[in-house]
């Protein structure tokens, strides 16, 4: 598994380089997650055209984003974040237009995934772990409902989010097999001997100000405490901040480009586990509040609070789970709104900022002391998704993610280590290029400095000795079935040969 985080300057050239890097490091990737802040379709197509010169895109899924990051390195525009899984993993992908009820769409996706896995891999290992990646469209507005179906039907952990753009909410899209799609649910799974753990957080805490939902239907709340919902929300903000209503109204919501009361003090509720979570407000219609999730009549909504330290600390605390991994890689889906709060790159400059908002940045501990390592990569979304065990949750103003254990074999210097198994240099060159890959003779010629005659001689020799195997076809594919098992047999063969030589040496010495 590898990741690529890159600013695209020359689409065709950069696409070719990306394709080369994926092919060189993982071969025919079983699954490619492709997240991009390239919002111009023609430019993105050129990147894909470049990649296709070296790799197929039939297992590539993803979406647009408002920005990507690797550690503290952010790319806001024309960037790509790619996660490519080695070809020995099992995978399947699906894409469905969300033009019918969520139950139908979710079940159709799940059925396609199950059928594909069953047909491609008739025999699954008992220790195979599967992980799902899902990418939604903001305009569809049925993320939670579809996630519930996917989680129920597939019973695997799922991570992902809603496609985003530059804050304009009119340029986002999804990606399926290297093609731009809209109004869909794009889904993929990857599995095998894959160690991972999921993370989630939001960085908000409840205040002691709350209101009862006295009239609601689905995602629309009409009344709080018997008053028009929007009016009561403004009152709650005024009560907590001690600011007059005209100031609250002026700075209530400002198009996801500047700090406002909605981002600092969203409404929230208590989940079934007793944890407080945010309830994302999509819009205000007259005096009603329209949320991105169903709000139950009779429940309570609480005013939430946060500051810069809580926002940063929330993600750092979750990343402590990576301490249980020897060589972790963390992939994060983070709400665009969180970056507006904590990253000036995503905010418009204000000369005269409201004094109350300055308190947001007065952290008790320097934010710089919370270190985000370079092995933490991610993208900015308009909604964050997680399904783990019985928890199936799509939210906003939050983050979800997955911690992977990277294979320790990626740190092995194969060219040096294989010399200890009595392989010749030219044989080592072929073996190194076939580890975790399936390649044709033509591809091996491009990757090695061997002549065609020499290469075919080595391929025949290694195949005869059982070091490599091949799949008949046009062209023929060469691969290594199990590198550990092969090296173990080679080691035992060397030990046996050494023992025979040792016995013969002793026999000769006795005769002298």
From Swiss-Prot:
It comes from the Archaea. InterPro entries: ArsR-like_HTH, FIST_C, FIST_domain_N, Tscrpt_reg_TrmB_N, WH-like_DNA-bd_sf, WH_DNA-bd_sf. PANTHER family: BLR0328 PROTEIN. This is Uncharacterized protein MJ1623.
